[in-house]
């Protein structure tokens, strides 16, 4: 896996646009509140206006993404692949939505408080690695921040131990706290709750 990661990094380093996206201020920590709930974010690459203009000059097709912005928030993702993900109750979903990166972008954007474009610099774990520069459109971020505003107090209540979480059966918390109370047929394992 170390060799695979090295190969993926080498692949990304060969691409000028990818490297420009990752050339901003690194690991910028910001704190703030959403609906009275504290949040802390760590931005992988915070681009300033000069870097954005340099990108648009070298890569004119990016002009629609950057517009006249004063910067951009870039999050680097090292992922299995960038293909749509099957969600049993929904169907095929873009990987960005399946793994909540759009929600993450909405939080980052709100905490940064400048509403800069939110971009993903994705590298896959495939061999050879695939790279992608992706944007999450503002209407999608706006919809997600409404979701965060509505749910933040509930999650804060869970975090403080005041509310018992609703179990989904598949998340990290559920796997860690699972208690067996039945024996099930292997053929139905995960049919209802599993999303892949």
Across the structure, where does each feature detected by a protein language model lie?
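Conserved catalytic cores of phosphodiester-cleaving nucleases, focusing on short active-site segments
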Residues: 41-92, 108
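Short, mixed charged/polar active-site loops
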Residues: 38-40, 69-71, 129-133
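Short, solvent-exposed loop/turn segments at secondary-structure junctions
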Residues: 31, 79-81, 125-127
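Alpha-helix initiation and capping sites
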Residues: 2-3, 39, 68, 98-102
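Metal-dependent nuclease catalytic cores that hydrolyze phosphodiester bonds in DNA/RNA
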Residues: 1-43, 166-172
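Sequence-level motif detector for i,i+2 pairs with an aromatic at +2
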Residues: 21-23, 69-71, 115
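Short acidic, glycine-rich loop/turn motifs
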Residues: 30-34, 47-49, 122-124
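Metal-dependent nuclease catalytic regions and adjoining charged, substrate-binding loops involved
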Residues: 95-196
């Amino acid at each position: 896996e170390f060799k695979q990661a090295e190969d993926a990094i080498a692949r990304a380093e060969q691409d000028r646009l990818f490297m420009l996206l990752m050339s901003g201020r690194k690991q910028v920590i910001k704190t703030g509140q959403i609906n009275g709930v504290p949040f802390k974010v760590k931005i992988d690459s915070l681009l300033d206006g000069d870097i954005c203009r340099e990108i648009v000059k070298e890569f004119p097709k990016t002009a629609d993404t950057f517009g006249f912005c004063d910067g951009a928030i870039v999050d680097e993702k090292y992922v299995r692949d960038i293909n749509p993900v099957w969600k049993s109750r929904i169907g095929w979903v873009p990987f960005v939505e399946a793994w909540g990166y759009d929600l993450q972008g909405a939080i980052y954007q709100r905490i940064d408080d400048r509403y800069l474009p939110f971009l993903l610099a994705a590298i896959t774990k495939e061999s050879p690695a695939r790279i992608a520069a992706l944007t999450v459109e503002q209407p999608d971020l706006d919809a997600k921040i409404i979701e965060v505003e509505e749910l933040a107090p509930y999650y804060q209540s869970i975090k403080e131990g005041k509310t018992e979480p609703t179990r989904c059966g598949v998340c990290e918390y559920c796997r860690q706290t699972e208690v067996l109370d039945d024996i099930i047929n292997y053929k139905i394992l995960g049919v209802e709750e599993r999303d892949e």
